[in-house]
Amino acid sequence: MTTHILFKGGPNSWEEYEIPLSNALKKTGLEYHLAEDISPEQVDYIVYAPSSRLNDFKPYTRCKAVLCLWAGVETIIGNKSLTMPLTRMVDSGMTQGMVEWVTGHVLRHHLGTDAHVIGQDGVWRNAIPPLAKDRTVTVLGLGALGVACATTLAGLGFSVRGWSRRPKTIENIATFHGEDGF
């Protein structure tokens, strides 16, 4: 029996995902039909990105799960028409990549790197940034990726604060939650 997998990503993301998803599915030995357009009553699974235009899941009566391409699911989790299980993507590569990207940009701003790169006018700028321990960094969102970034920055000596919807306790990070904590 063929498993019907509907891909609903953001604009132009089909070109990026079609081949890798097809290759991964072939390795499973599963008989499948992966496409951007499948009749709702035939869909077994939806591969989904919150940037897609799909926001009504009611017609997908046979759908067993929505497989989110992103770690963040805050834009879909409250959708009343989403009655099937929802998964989110978290893998070590995504986490490591996000940690590197965030750390790089925090250090870029902390050290004032842009002033040195852009200021190629021959004038020496003797600006000395504060030590990391004297700089506060706040992470808004303490999901898997946010916690990984926050703990890395705390490990570099930054004073780190973090906010989440629900209470969390994270070593070396001052945490706040809910509307009152924002």
Q: Model-predicted segments: where are they?
A:
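Residue-level detector of anion-binding/catalytic polar loops
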Residues: E31, P85, S159
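Short, polar loop motifs at secondary-structure junctions
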Residues: A35-D37, P50-L54, W70-E74, G162-T169
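Rossmann-like dinucleotide/phosphate-binding beta-alpha-beta segment
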Residues: I128-F182
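Short, structured coil segments at secondary-structure junctions
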Residues: T28, T61-R62, K80-T83, L156, ...
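Phosphate/diphosphate ligand-binding glycine-rich loop within oxidoreductases
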Residues: D44-G119
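A short, basic/flexible loop-to-alpha-helix module at the beginning of a structural domain
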Residues: Q120-P130
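Short acidic low-complexity segments
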Residues: E31-Q42, N55-D56, E171-F182
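N-terminal glycine-/charge-rich "phosphate-binding" loop or analogous flexible N-terminal tail
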Residues: M1-D44
